[in-house]
Amino acid sequence: MSEKIDKAMQLFKESRYKESIDAFHAVLETEPDNADVYNNLAVAYSCVADFSHAETYFTKSLELDPQLAQAYINLSDLYYKSGDLASAVGTLQRGSYELPDNLAIAHLLARVYIDDQRWEDAIVELERVLDGEPENYDAFYDLGHVCFELGDYDGAISNFETVTEYRQDSELLYYSLAQAYEANNEIDKAISNYLKSIAVNDKFTLAYKKVAILFMARNDFDDAIEYFEEYTNFEIPQEEKESVNKLIERIKLKQG
């Protein structure tokens, strides 16, 4: 039987999904209670965009083995990608109940809560993740995002700064940190982190406009002009480019 499973898995790895579906069904003829095979079969169906069969076989997998963490993750992902956040949440909540020590499920549940703007619920799950994994920097980043959305800018800054101790290669991290400093009216630190975002990725368009605006607000007109001009060199809508060019001209007039 192991040979049949290996064959089905090999077909799947080769992206021969329809053939792998047939092969998994052949296994189930003699192993009708194999939860892992049902899970793999469901994944294969999801790869050919057969939502109905994928849902059916993920559900069957969990009926046979309520402790199969990957099936909860896969089924919730199926619902999430279809836009059914309520079912994604329900699946992960059940998985979290069955597997209270599985922090991967807890973290995924937090992220679905974030997408559904259930901020307080997300905080509960993220804090649970961080209690068990105090160096989970993705969870710190997500918690920073939630704090920002709730207007807790000090909390957002604290969480994002924690992540920067571990990662210095993410323009989005520095951009998020800069936004939090800006919202907290700490303009110098906001500028510093927008510039760090650009240093990591000099094609990150949004940071150029943001830092230019802050330079302008600080009356650093030469720097504002420099970054606005850099911004207009990117592929941005013509209307936006014309608007920024007019702003540059007004700044130059103000300089005299």
Residue map of PLM features:
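Alpha-helical adaptor scaffolds
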Residues: 111, 138-141, 145-154, 158-192
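Helix-start (N-cap) detector for alpha-helical repeat units in TPR-like alpha-solenoids
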Residues: 1, 35-36, 69-70, 102-104, ...
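Structural marker of alpha-solenoid helical repeat scaffolds
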Residues: 30, 64, 98-99, 132, ...
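Structural signature of tandem alpha-helical TPR/SEL1-like repeats
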Residues: 14-22, 48-60, 82-94, 116-128, ...
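Short, charge-rich amphipathic alpha-helical segments embedded
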Residues: 26-47
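Terminal, low-structured helical/coil segments at or just beyond the last alpha-helical repeat
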Residues: 1-7, 221, 225-256
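Canonical tetratricopeptide repeat
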Residues: 40-43, 47, 74, 108, ...
